[in-house]
C-alpha cells in the first residue's frame, strides 16, 4: 500500500475514533441539561420534593458527561493541527471563526453558570439557581448551533471564494445558514434529546425492575417516554426532509446510502437489504421494493435517482459502509417509535409501571440512542467522502505530511488513554445510575460544602460519591 494513503487511512481512523468518543458525551449533556431545567421548573411551580431529588441526581450524571465532553473536545480539536494541517490551512478562515464563536458564546455561557447550577443550592435563591440551570441548557443548544454550522458548511459549502489556494469568506450569513444547516441542526438537536430520554427511561426501568415505586423513579420514567413519543416520530419526519435536501446537494451520497448503481427510469426501487460490492459495482442479494425509493426520496411514484455509475469511481463514497450504517440508524429509530407507542398503550391501560416485559425492553433500548447517533454520523461523514469540503477539497489533500508510523503511534496512544479515562467515566456514570435518586425518606444534604479537601472548582466536584462507594 502507498505510504501516503496508509497515513491518510490511519488519520481518518484516528479522527473517527476520537470524534465517536467525543460526540456521545455532548449529546447526553445537551439532552440532560434541558431535562434538568424542566425538572427544576416543575419543582419551583409545584413544590413537590421529588422534582428536586431528580434535579440533584441527574445533575451528578450531567457533571460527569459535561467534563468528559470538554476533555474529549479539546483533544479532538488538536487533531486539526496535527493530522489535518492541509484542511486547517485551506479552510481555517471559515471553520476557525465558527469554532471561536462557539467558545465565545456557548462555552462561556455554560462555564459561567455551571458552577452555580452544580454548587449553588442554598447559596443563591431558588429562582436564581433555576436561571443558572436554564442558561447552561441554552448554552448547550447554542454550542450545537455553531458546531453544526461548521460541519454543514463542509457538507454544502457556500459564501466564499478561493484566493491563492485558500478559502476567503465573502458572505457569513450564507456560510452559517448553508443549504443543509437547518436540517442537520434539528436532526442533531432532537437526536441529543432522544439519547437523553432513552438513558433516563432505561434508568427508571432498572429501578422499577428492582422494585422501587417511589414518585421520583416513576416520574422520570414517565417523562422520558412522553418525550420519546413526541420526538421519535418528529425525528423521522425531519430525517425525510434531510434526505430530500441531501439528494439535491449530495446525490452521490444518496446513491451510496441506497446501494443504487444504475439510473432507472420509470421509478426507482428501494433496496431494503443487500451487500453493496464496490469492485463489482452492484448490490448483491438485494431485496427490492419497486418504486419505494422514488416515493421516499422524491415524493413521487416515478422520480429519478442517479445511480453510482453516473459518477467517476474516485468520487464515489463507500456504499458498503453507509448502506448499513444508515439502516442501523433507521432500524433503531423504528424501534424507538415502537417503544414509545407501547408505552402509550400501557399508560392508557394503567400498566406502565407494572409491565416487567416492557421495562426490560426499555432497559435494553437505553444504549440504542448512542448507537443510532454514531451510525448517523458515520452515514453523513463517510457519505461525504472523498471530500472533506464537499466538491471543493479532497480528504487526501487535507491530511498533514506525516508517515504511517507516526500516525499509528499516536493512534495507539489515543486508544489506550481513551479506554482508560473514558472507560472509567462511563463506569462511574453507570454506577451513579444504578444507585438511583435518593429515596423519599432519605433527605438530600444540599448545604454548602465547606470541606477543605472538596473545593467546588470543576464539574466532577459535583459528584460526592467515590466509585468504590456508589
Outline where the language-model segments fall:
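Polytopic transmembrane helical bundles with strong interfacial aromatic enrichment
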Residues: 1-470
Amino acid at each position: 500500500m502507498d505510504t501516503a494513503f496508509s497515513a491518510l487511512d490511519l488519520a481518518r481512523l484516528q479522527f473517527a475514533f476520537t470524534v465517536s468518543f467525543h460526540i456521545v458525551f455532548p449529546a447526553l449533556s445537551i439532552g440532560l441539561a434541558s431535562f434538568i431545567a424542566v425538572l427544576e421548573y416543575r419543582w419551583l411551580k409545584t413544590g413537590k420534593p421529588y422534582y428536586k431529588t431528580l434535579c440533584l441526581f441527574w445533575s451528578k450524571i450531567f457533571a460527569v458527561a459535561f467534563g468528559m465532553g470538554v476533555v474529549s473536545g479539546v483533544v479532538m480539536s488538536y487533531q486539526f493541527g496535527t493530522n489535518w494541517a492541509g484542511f486547517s490551512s485551506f479552510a481555517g478562515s471559515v471553520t476557525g471563526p465558527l469554532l471561536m464563536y462557539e467558545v465565545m458564546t456557548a462555552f462561556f455561557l455554560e462555564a459561567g453558570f455551571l458552577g452555580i447550577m452544580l454548587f449553588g443550592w442554598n447559596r443563591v435563591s431558588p429562582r436564581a439557581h433555576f436561571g443558572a440551570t436554564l442558561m447552561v441548557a441554552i448554552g448547550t443548544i447554542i454550542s450545537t448551533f455553531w458546531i453544526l454550522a461548521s460541519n454543514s458548511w463542509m457538507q454544502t459549502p457556500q459564501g466564499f471564494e478561493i484566493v491563492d489556494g485558500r478559502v476567503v469568506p465573502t458572505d457569513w450569513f450564507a456560510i452559517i445558514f448553508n443549504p443543509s444547516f437547518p436540517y442537520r441542526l434539528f436532526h442533531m438537536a432532537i437526536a441529543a434529546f432522544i439519547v437523553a430520554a432513552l438513558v433516563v427511561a432505561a434508568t427508571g426501568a432498572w429501578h422499577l425492575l428492582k422494585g422501587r415505586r417511589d414518585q421520583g423513579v416513576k416520574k422520570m420514567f414517565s417523562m422520558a417516554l412522553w418525550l420519546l413519543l413526541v420526538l421519535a416520530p418528529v425525528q423521522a419526519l425531519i430525517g425525510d426532509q434531510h434526505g430530500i435536501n441531501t439528494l439535491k446537494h449530495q446525490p452521490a451520497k444518496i446513491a451510496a446510502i441506497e446501494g443504487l448503481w444504475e439510473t432507472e427510469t420509470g421509478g426507482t426501487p428501494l433496496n431494503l437489504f443487500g451487500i453493496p460490492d464496490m469492485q463489482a459495482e452492484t448490490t448483491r442479494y438485494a431485496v427490492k421494493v419497486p418504486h419505494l425509493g422514488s416515493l421516499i426520496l422524491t415524493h413521487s411514484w416515478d422520480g429519478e435517482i442517479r445511480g453510482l455509475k453516473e459518477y467517476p469511481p474516485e468520487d464515489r463514497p463507500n456504499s458498503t459502509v453507509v448502506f448499513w450504517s444508515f439502516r442501523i440508524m433507521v432500524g433503531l429509530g423504528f424501534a424507538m417509535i415502537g417503544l414509545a407507542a407501547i408505552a402509550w398503550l400501557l399508560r392508557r391501560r394503567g400498566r406502565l409501571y407494572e409491565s416487567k416485559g416492557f421495562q426490560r425492553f426499555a432497559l435494553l433500548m437505553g444504549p440504542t440512542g448512542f448507537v443510532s447517533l454514531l451510525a448517523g454520523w458515520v452515514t453523513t461523514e463517510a457519505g461525504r467522502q472523498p471530500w472533506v469540503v464537499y466538491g471543493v477539497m479532497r480528504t487526501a489533500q487535507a491530511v498533514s505530511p506525516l508517515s504511517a508510523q507516526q500516525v499509528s503511534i499516536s493512534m495507539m496512544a489515543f486508544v489506550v488513554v481513551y479506554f482508560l479515562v473514558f472507560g472509567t467515566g462511563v463506569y462511574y456514570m453507570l454506577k451513579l445510575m444504578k444507585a438511583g435518586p435518593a429515596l423519599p425518606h432519605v433527605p438530600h444534604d444540599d448545604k454548602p460544602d465547606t470541606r477543605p479537601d472538596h473545593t467546588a472548582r470543576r464539574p466532577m466536584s459535583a459528584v460526592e460519591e467515590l466509585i468504590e462507594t456508589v
